[in-house]
A protein has these predicted regions:
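Terminal peptide-recognition signature
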Residues: 58, 70, 76, 80, ...
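Conserved catalytic-core segment of clan PA serine endopeptidases
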Residues: 38-52, 95-182, 208-212, 227-230
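Residues that flank catalytic or metal-binding motifs in active/ligand-binding sites
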Residues: 54-56, 66-68, 74, 100, ...
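Short glycine/Trp-rich loop-beta-loop segment that forms part of the substrate-binding cleft
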Residues: 178-212
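Helix-boundary and membrane-interface capping/anchor signal
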Residues: 37, 47, 63-66, 174, ...
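Solvent-exposed loop/turn segments at secondary-structure junctions
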Residues: 65-67, 78-79, 84-86, 163-166, ...
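Extracellular trypsin-like serine protease catalytic domains
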Residues: 217-234
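Protease-domain processing segments flanking chymotrypsin-fold serine proteases, especially trypsin-like
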Residues: 2-7, 11, 21-78, 87-100
Length: 234
């Protein structure tokens, strides 16, 4: 029998851990662990807390104290980074048989919902926009040693046990992006994006310095590169 800590203790442990952040940019962009939402020095991490409560970008919480950001693409499917879950095999994620329970919460401040999920036996609570996961699949290429778990094939999907009927979904873009308005040293590729997620943050001076507080942050930037690993000199 596994003995579970209470919700507050579990969240405190997660906040102290070295947690990974993935972000949604435009429809979705999955980021490596080193990425964080870092505003310039005119704004603080408090200033960039997302003012929209439920917008389809949610936080994934594993009962073993690991969190990531994911994006709802239909009422029962969330897309997120494989490195958030590929340390275990997919059958190991379960609310029964001693598995690791997983849920997604979609409120801007996800702490109350996650505490409720842990304290009440890992149950979906639609009133708090918290949905239990009943199936996970991740790309096998994310396990390739040269990939370091995220350099390529870093994509996973989770199925929710209850449709998130009242949560907005995001459309995935598979066609080419339209040409940007301008490309220069300031705009990089010229593609202006909105970046949002629950990961670490900081300021322009301190960089990635503030831990996860279970609140969704939002910022704007320009993409510095839009390409593949083959475009980067090793």
């Amino acid at each position: 029998m596994r003995i579970r800590k209470n919700g507050a203790e579990m969240l405190a442990r997660a906040g102290r851990s070295s947690l990974l952040a993935s972000v949604a940019a435009a429809a979705l962009s999955i980021a490596p662990a080193a990425q964080a939402v870092v505003p310039n020095d005119n704004l603080s991490p408090e200033d960039i807390v997302d003012g929209t409560d439920v917008n389809g970008v949610g936080i994934m919480y594993r009962d073993d104290g690991f969190v990531c950001t994911g994006t709802l693409i239909n009422p029962r499917t969330v897309i997120f980074a494989a490195h958030c879950v590929n340390d275990l095999s997919t059958p190991d994620y379960s609310t029964v048989n001693g598995g690791v329970p997983v849920a997604f919460a979609f409120q801007s401040d996800a702490r109350p919902g996650l505490i409720d999920w842990i304290s009440n036996g890992y149950r979906t609570n639609t009133a708090l926009s918290v949905y239990n996961v009943n199936n996970i699949a991740y790309h096998p290429d994310s396990l390739d040693p040269p990939a370091l778990s995220f350099l390529y094939g870093d994509v996973a999907m989770a199925t929710l046990d209850t449709p998130a009927a009242d949560v907005p979904t995001w459309t995935m873009l598979f066609s080419a992006l339209p040409a940007p308005a301008a490309i220069n040293e300031t705009t990089g590729t010229g593609y202006h994006v909105t970046v949002t997620g629950y990961g670490r943050t900081g300021s322009g001076t301190t960089g990635n310095s503030v831990g996860i507080d279970f609140r969704r942050k939002t910022a704007e930037n320009f993409l510095g590169m839009l390409g593949s690993l083959d475009d980067i000199d090793s």
